Curated annotation (Swiss-Prot):
GO terms for biological process: guard mother cell differentiation; regulation of cell cycle; regulation of cell cycle G1/S phase transition; regulation of DNA endoreduplication; regulation of stomatal complex patterning. It comes from Arabidopsis thaliana. Its EC number is 2.7.11.22, 2.7.11.23. This is Cyclin-dependent kinase B1-2. Keywords: ATP-binding, Kinase, Nucleotide-binding, Phosphoprotein, Serine/threonine-protein kinase, Transferase. One of its GO terms (molecular function) is cyclin-dependent protein serine/threonine kinase activity.
């Protein structure tokens, strides 16, 4: 790791510490993710190797944060502690200095609160669908999409998906290591209800929540427990029925909930165009099989006024 000078710790990600660093020879900024992957005598677990090769392949899309290289650091052997040297994997990513959460916050708080421009939301959504469609076409679910995981290249106006593809080998814990609870606000109802057979539709639900948040500048469903999260969803969209969502009552964590009627979604996102409301409605369907796919979303009328040739 002599190649890099660590400048500051920028986060404690779901998978380990994240540092802003500089490549000494070029002066280029990178993000170093130190993964908590204890090696054994066998070396790097094959699951991790598969994930890394997948990540390298996926990061060929400009809408996915690029994985530049992987550094395997073996720490010097300490005979008093263990018989074999410990080693760490560092994933070296391109560095981007802001994320969608910070960007939304800057429009909500501070000296100049203002809505995000409708055309900007449209551009960000198109890029997000491009990135998600790219992942899904390779059979990869993100499973933890949220504004903090969407990094922005403000100069080029590009949105990129981060923290991707590690979700299987490194299993997403319920608590990040700073003991903040991993947010439930973007989690699909089938996951909250304990379904183990989920699909690409879980990511579409998350993208729908992110879409609404860009319009509202605050979370659509800000629950602080799995139960409260479901109640937030049911109060707005109505309590799901077996007719609407076949099999919902057989899910592991289904209980008898109060029966709420669906509200008018446009009241939750009053400044969104009718086409935008239609797209959001198709993303927040209870039955995962009925949710629009990322690929189909790219052709939705909401994007008709967008010059797609630039993407």
């Amino acid at each position: 790791m002599e190649k890099y000078e660590k400048l500051e710790k920028v986060g404690e990600g779901t998978y380990g510490k994240v540092y802003k660093a500089m490549e000494k020879t070029t002066g280029k900024l990178v993000a170093l993710k130190k993964t908590r992957l204890e090696m054994d005598e066998e070396g790097i677990p094959p699951t991790a190797l598969r994930e890394i090769s997948l990540l390298q392949m996926l990061s060929q899309s400009i809408y996915i944060v690029r994985l530049l290289c992987v550094e395997h650091v073996i720490q010097s052997k300490d005979s008093t502690v263990s018989h074999s040297p410990k080693s760490n994997l560092y994933l070296v990513f391109e560095y981007l200095d802001t994320d969608l959460k910070k960007f939304i916050d800057s429009h909500r708080k501070g000296s100049n609160p203002r809505p995000l421009e409708a055309s900007l939301v449209q551009r960000f959504m198109f890029q997000l669908f491009k990135g998600v469609a790219h992942c899904h076409s390779h059979g990869v679910l993100h499973r933890d999409l949220k504004p903090q995981n969407l990094l922005l290249d403000k100069d080029k106006g590009i949105l990129k998906i981060a923290d991707l593809g590690l979700s299987r080998a490194f299993t997403v814990p319920l608590k990040a290591y700073t003991h903040e609870i991993v947010t439930l606000w973007y989690r699909a109802p089938e996951v909250l209800l304990g379904s183990t057979h989920y699909s690409t539709a879980v990511d579409i639900w998350s993208v729908g929540c992110i879409f609404a948040e860009m319009i509202r500048r605050q979370a659509l469903f800000p629950g602080d427990s799995e139960f409260q999260q479901l109640l937030h969803i049911f109060r707005l969209l109505g309590t799901p029925t077996e007719q609407q969502w076949p099999g919902v009552m057989a899910l592991r964590d289904w209980h008898v909930y109060p029966k709420w009627e669906p509200q008018d979604l446009s009241r939750a996102v009053p400044s969104l165009s009718p086409e935008g409301i239609d797209l959001l409605t198709q993303m927040l369907k209870y039955n995962p099989a009925e949710r629009i796919s990322a690929k189909a979303a790219l052709d939705h009328p909401y994007f008709d006024s967008l010059d797609k040739s630039q993407f």
